[in-house]
Amino acid sequence: MARLCAFLMTLLVMSYWSTCSLGCDLPQTHNLRNKRALTLLAQMRRLSPLSCLKDRKNFRFPQEKVDAQQIKKAQVIPVLSELTQQILTLFTSKDSSAAWNTTLLDSFCNDLHQQLNDLQGCLMQQVGVQEPPLTQEDSLLAVRKYFHRITVYLREKKHSPCAWEVVRAEVWRTLSSSAKLLARLSEKE
C-alpha cells in the first residue's frame, strides 16, 4: 500500500511539474554550443561560394513549419532535436569525413552530439505528458523530407567538394534558424 501511495504521489508531482514547465530548461551551455557549431561550420568552408554557383540548389527549408514566431513552445524541443539529429547524421557519414578538416569536423560533431543529448533529456521528460500535436508531426516530417532532399542532392553530385560547400552553407542557415527556436524557449507565453 505504501508503494502504491508513493507511486501515485510521484505521478502527481511529475504531471504537475510537466504541465507547468512545458518541457525543461536546457543548460546555458546549449546556446554556447549552438553558437560554437555555427562558428565551426563557417571555419569548415574550403571553397569560395562563388566558385560553386552552378551547384546551388533550393532545398526548400520548411520555414513555415519551424518558424519561431508560429511554432508552439511545446513543439520547439522535438523540432530542434530532429534538426540536430539530421545534421549530425549528415556530417558523420563516411562521405562527409573526406570533405572536411578532421579536427573541425570532430569538434562540430561533438558540439552537435552534446546538443542532441541535452534535447533528448528534455524529450524524455516530455514523454507521456501530452500527445504530440499534428502540427508537430507535420513539422518533424517536413524536417525529415528537407534533409532527404539534401542527401539525394549529395548523392546526385557524387559528394563533390562544391556539393558539400553548398550543403555546408545550407546547414549554416538551418542552424541559424535553430538559434531563433532556442530563443523561443525562453519567451513567456
Swiss-Prot record:
Glycans are attached at residue 101. GO terms for cellular component: extracellular space. It is found in: Secreted. Disulfide bonds join 24-122, 52-162. Pfam families: Interferon. One of its GO terms (biological process) is defense response to virus. Residues 1-23 form the signal peptide. GO terms for molecular function: cytokine activity; cytokine receptor binding. Keywords: Antiviral defense, Cytokine, Disulfide bond, Glycoprotein, Secreted, Signal. Belongs to the alpha/beta interferon family. Produced by macrophages, IFN-alpha have antiviral activities. Interferon stimulates the production of two enzymes: a protein kinase and an oligoadenylate synthetase. This is Interferon alpha-12.
